Amino acid sequence: MDGQRYTFPTEKTYLSWFSDFSRVRTISDAELSGIQLAMKNVTMRPGTQLVKITTNPQVFAVTAGGVLHWVQGNEAFAASLYGSNWARRVVDVPDSFFTNFSIGAPITTAVHPDGTLVTYAGSADRFVVVGGQLRRVTDAGFSANMFQSGN
């Protein structure tokens, strides 16, 4: 990327990007200290989970660059976007890490934000939202982008 060291603040954040820890490489303390620490932590992977902080009930979708979009409305509205099991996708982010995100426009219509992975009941097809449009993701593209079915 840019030669800097980025910190995953929580295991759940890491697992939104990778399915396991098999790609983590152990390096010496000397090597580690030679890599500049980035000024921000890694945020939840866009389109994979919904987030909230423990002290506020608002639920947010995450888009590129760690931008949060409040999913405005009631539970039925959230279900229309993310399915009946939408609450299982909500990850509590510790308040101290909430500053890693920035706030964008709220989601007020049943339109998925860019970067969201979408599947439909009864279909094996997978889509990603790009420029407001659904784009089918092939198996090769799914694997190459390290998408995960569980997210």
Where are these regions (language model features)?
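Short, surface-exposed polybasic-aromatic patches that bind anionic ligands, especially phosphate groups
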Residues: 1-151
